[in-house]
Amino acid sequence: MGGSGVARKPGILIIVENLTVPLDRRVWQEACALRDAGYTVSVVCPKGGRYQDKYELLDGIHVFRHPLPFEARSAAGYLLEYSSALAFEFALSVKAYFKVGFDAVQACNPPDLLFLSGGFWKYLFGKPFVLDHHDINPELYEAKFGRRGFFHRVLGILERLTFRVADASLA
């Protein structure tokens, strides 16, 4: 890249909303495995616990963190939480692109709104989008709130859209 003549290692951007790294052990292990395989890894995640830095290079992994303004307790609360997180995650993905660079995006659900960020990078910049499918959100909604209905249907639609946009999925 650039005029230096030095090739950049291929890069992976991982986006996770529900927990910071390295506390999200599954995501952290995936990031470390990618790093060990020779990739440059960037992770976008919320701040949490003692991990409050907006940016840090942690064990060779670039970590970009955003605030999580509140934790939802209702369906409307989840909509607000996920919307604000999505905006932060998109902005930080742009920052990661210019600061570190990446060649593919891996998004970890929930929420099943991350197809918006993944689709942006896929359709406008040709970056493959991989869904790391952690949770079955329509079923979690039903278990948590004891009912189906409008939000359950919306979650099912978002889940299908996420799978449709993804080039591959991990479970």
Regions found by a protein language model. Name each.
Residues 46-48, 68, 133-134:
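Active-site loop/turn elements of alpha/beta-hydrolase fold enzymes
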Residues 70-72, 137-140:
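Feature marks short, surface-exposed loop/turn motifs that line or immediately flank catalytic pockets
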Residues 51, 85-89, 102-126, 130-139:
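An aromatic- and histidine-rich active-site surface loop
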Residues 1-63:
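N-terminal subdomain of nucleotide-sugar transferases
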Residues 11, 103-104, 168:
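Structural motif
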Residues 96-102:
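Glycine-rich phosphate-binding loop signature in dinucleotide/nucleotide-binding domains
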Residues 62-91, 147-151:
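A short, charged, and often flexible helix/loop element on the N-terminal side
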Residues 94, 113-116, 120-125, 131, ...:
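Membrane-proximal helix-turn-helix segments that form the acceptor-binding/catalytic region
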